[in-house]
């Protein structure tokens, strides 16, 4: 059996292409089932977010698994298989495990270390579980990856520092005020950066937010979308009297907030602190307003220094996490190797217990006068003999799991004891017209 990860992400396809190959939320369940019914696929989990569409699968063979996954994606989105091949990364074996660990812990995200992907991976796994498209391998591997990511975020600072300008703007406000949930915020502009700033403010607990924009309808649309207030640009001087935080991002060629405007309202503010963060280029806020008492201004250069420093911190944290990935891969492989041993040991125990039961039946026939107490004593001792006899063979079987030729040696082990281990994938293998009775080999 082989682990395969087929990924369409921000490295392999631009946003226009990624939009074409994103599963809608209500289509993920049926997509998992459709893929599971595909030849060669034994387990699968589908992950689809704004930045990536990925298929994780356990397949009977690498080349057929990869082919059927890519064909499935092409069919799902009405594209040619060659188009899908050109926009996918394919990882197999240990590299597939490594990829899942990196994705889950935010190391493969557009924003290094972001935590949203962890929840998305968890949801994708749970959905697949509910549709019975996961089995022994993925039920273990995805839980391992989720646990690893949680531990990575708890033990490092990878998600603690802002690495986007809009997020840094809000973080800077927190540095000035401490808590911002009780502050009033004003956003000047209604473009993408303004919306990101708005979302970060909302995420930080700010509820009193007003948007102003030269085109009032755009301010209204954005405000209604996120349930905040909006005002015309003409209201700006009046709004500046009461707000605590201003984030400005317009495409204006002239200053939106001027020294003169701020001087005129400074006495009305009663010396309450006003933090103004200008993320526009060219700048929206006239420089040198710091000369006005209790007013503080920051521009993109100030934020860039914060973002760069934070990114360096995240990169250092990422390096710590990366160092732990080989240990996780090794732990996974050790667990997988034991999978081949468990059914062998079970078969050995079942045969031994069958012999013990047959022996007790023979004793009952030959010694019908045994009391219940005597029978229990004999049964206990025969079981004890069997357990003692099995101790060394079971120990040897477990040690075979780490051998490079474990499959061959386990087959010999079964032959010596005349046992046949059950295969967890028997039904699926029959569907795929594969030979039955093999010991699983994972890569």
Swiss-Prot record:
Gene label: hemA
Involved pathway(s): Porphyrin-containing compound metabolism; protoporphyrin-IX biosynthesis; 5-aminolevulinate from L-glutamyl-tRNA(Glu): step 1/2
Functional description taken from the UniProt entry: Catalyzes the NADPH-dependent reduction of glutamyl-tRNA(Glu) to glutamate 1-semialdehyde (GSA).
One example of a Gene Ontology biological process annotation: protoporphyrinogen IX biosynthetic process
Active site: 50
Protein residues bound to NADP(+): 189-194
Other known facts: During catalysis, the active site Cys acts as a nucleophile attacking the alpha-carbonyl group of tRNA-bound glutamate with the formation of a thioester intermediate between enzyme and glutamate, and the concomitant release of tRNA(Glu). The thioester intermediate is finally reduced by direct hydride transfer from NADPH, to form the product GSA.
A Pfam entry, by short name: Shikimate_DH
Domain remark in the UniProt entry: Possesses an unusual extended V-shaped dimeric structure with each monomer consisting of three distinct domains arranged along a curved 'spinal' alpha-helix. The N-terminal catalytic domain specifically recognizes the glutamate moiety of the substrate. The second domain is the NADPH-binding domain, and the third C-terminal domain is responsible for dimerization.
NCBIfam families: hemA
Name of the featured protein: Glutamyl-tRNA reductase
Top-level class of the enzyme under EC nomenclature: oxidoreductase
Protein family per UniProt: Belongs to the glutamyl-tRNA reductase family.
UniProt entry tagged with the keyword Oxidoreductase: yes
CDD domains cross-referenced by the UniProt entry: NAD_bind_Glutamyl_tRNA_reduct
Catalytic activity: (S)-4-amino-5-oxopentanoate + tRNA(Glu) + NADP(+) = L-glutamyl-tRNA(Glu) + NADPH + H(+)
Keyword annotations from UniProtKB, A to Z: NADP, Oxidoreductase, Porphyrin biosynthesis
Gene Ontology molecular functions: glutamyl-tRNA reductase activity; NADP binding
Site (Important for activity): 99
Binding site for substrate: 49-52, 109, 114-116, 120
E.C. number: 1.2.1.70
Subunit field text: Homodimer.
